[in-house]
């Protein structure tokens, strides 16, 4: 499985690195992320000017190809598809965002913007967020098993999964709540 990973918090975000490490358990991982902080950009794309695409040879996760783009999170998906990846990915991951993406926040989220750009290109996607971006214990414990469970069922190119993890002791959780977008 080929997985593109992007985010809105930038190439050096600890959450991105956690997500990339998890994704390595599922297949071949390509990272294309903004060069800086791009929160609340929604699905904004750069229409005028040029974008700077740079390889990141010192990316801290071994075996991962990583680039940075001087544009928005949605630009990262566009650039990955047009200039970086030799083939369309099977799946796009976005995150791990520092803060939940729930309710009307999803309308502004650059993390969700990545998944919407994937959706526009016929690629299924998953967005990952945590309560505060610092305590990733629940995400670390639940992400891989939950993603594997979701991938056991057919995932369609018109689907986006939005996974939000609390910041607490993983033993405090009682389970997973599944909601459709209509329940925002």
For the regions a protein language model found, what residue spans apply to each?
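A cross-family phosphate/adenosyl-ligand binding-site feature
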Residues: 3-6, 14-83, 87-88
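Hydrophobic/aromatic beta-strand patches that form the interior of the parallel beta-sheet core
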Residues: 30-32, 67, 126-128, 161-163
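Glycine/small-residue-rich loop that forms an oxyanion/phosphate-binding "nest" at active or ligand-binding sites
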Residues: 91, 95-100
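Glycine/threonine-rich flexible loop motifs
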Residues: 100-109
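Class I SAM-dependent methyltransferase SAM-binding "motif I" and its flanking Rossmann-like core
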Residues: 116-131
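Short, glycine-/small-residue-rich phosphate/pyrophosphate-handling segment
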Residues: 127, 131-149
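A charged, well-structured terminal subsegment
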Residues: 145-173
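Conserved small/polar residues in nucleotide/adenosyl-binding loops
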Residues: 182-184
């Amino acid at each position: 499985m080929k997985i593109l990973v992007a985010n809105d918090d930038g190439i050096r975000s600890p959450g991105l690195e956690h997500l990339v490490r998890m994704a390595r358990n599922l297949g071949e991982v390509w990272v294309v992320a903004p060069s800086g902080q791009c929160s609340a950009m929604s699905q904004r794309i750069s229409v005028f000017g040029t974008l700077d695409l740079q390889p990141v040879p010192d990316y801290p996760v071994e075996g991962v190809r990583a680039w940075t783009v001087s544009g928005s999170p949605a630009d990262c998906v566009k650039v990955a598809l047009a200039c970086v990846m030799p083939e369309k990915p099977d799946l796009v991951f976005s995150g791990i965002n520092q803060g939940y993406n729930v309710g009307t926040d999803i309308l502004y989220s650059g993390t969700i913007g990545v998944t919407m750009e994937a959706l526009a290109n016929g690629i299924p996607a998953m967005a990952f967020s945590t309560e505060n971006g610092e305590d990733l214990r629940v995400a670390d414990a639940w992400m891989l098993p939950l993603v594997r469970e979701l991938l056991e069922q057919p995932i369609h190119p018109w689907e986006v999964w939005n996974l939000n993890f609390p910041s607490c002791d993983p033993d405090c959780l009682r389970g997973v709540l599944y909601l459709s977008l209509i329940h925002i």
